[in-house]
């Protein structure tokens, strides 16, 4: 099992998005006497979130798509737990100028989320497709280039490849529990249940 990432580890972002976040953190640290708290949530899901909705819609259409053959270790946080962490960071004493990872405290394999989605959607039959990373990389590169030439934006680009190719998303939330008083309230199963119920109630599915 891969080691947990901690807030004290040296950051090595592999996407433009991650690099922009790191630069923002570095800038904040250069401002003297500025009171700030940095939260680093892992995979955020819940009502209105669209990236994981795409997975739910795909499963409702009988396709479960995954990439890479090496097992992933993934972490998630339900949006309500993230809000809890944000609110606690506003009032917790002595946490200024600190960074915290936020998750539900558990580590999951790459099928955990899709299996829970499938259960909440009534266990539809599935065609499971697992593409090799080289194929995903080629698709993301070609699609990103075409959209860039056409002046369009796309989420299927080299950044997305690096996100999906990452195998270790484990993180240490002990400091958030100890210093913020953060306590995850939602298991992945509970969060997925609420999320799918919201999708259905608002006719997303």
Give the residues covered by each predicted segment.
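Catalytic helix-loop patch of NAD(P)-dependent Rossmann-fold dehydrogenases
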Residues: 1-43, 64-68
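Amphipathic terminal alpha-helices
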Residues: 171-179, 183, 187-205
């Amino acid at each position: 099992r891969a080691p947990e990432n901690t807030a004290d580890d040296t950051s090595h972002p592999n996407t433009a998005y991650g690099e922009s976040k790191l630069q923002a953190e570095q800038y904040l640290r250069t401002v003297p006497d500025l009171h700030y708290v940095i939260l680093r949530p892992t995979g955020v899901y819940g009502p209105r979130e669209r990236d994981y909705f795409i997975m739910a819609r795909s499963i409702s259409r009988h396709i479960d798509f995954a990439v890479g053959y090496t097992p992933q270790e993934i972490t998630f946080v339900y949006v309500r737990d993230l809000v809890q962490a944000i609110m606690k960071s506003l009032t917790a004493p002595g946490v200024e100028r600190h960074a915290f990872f936020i998750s539900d405290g558990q580590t999951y394999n790459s099928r955990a989320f899709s299996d829970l989605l499938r259960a909440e959607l009534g266990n539809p039959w599935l065609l499971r497709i697992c593409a090799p990373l080289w194929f995903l990389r080629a698709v993301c590169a070609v699609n990103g280039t075409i959209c860039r030439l056409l002046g369009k934006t796309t989420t299927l680009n080299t950044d997305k490849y690096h996100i999906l190719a990452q195998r270790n998303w484990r993180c240490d939330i002990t400091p958030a529990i100890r210093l913020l008083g953060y306590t995850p309230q939602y298991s992945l199963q509970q969060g997925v249940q609420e999320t799918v119920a919201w999708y259905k109630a608002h006719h997303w599915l």
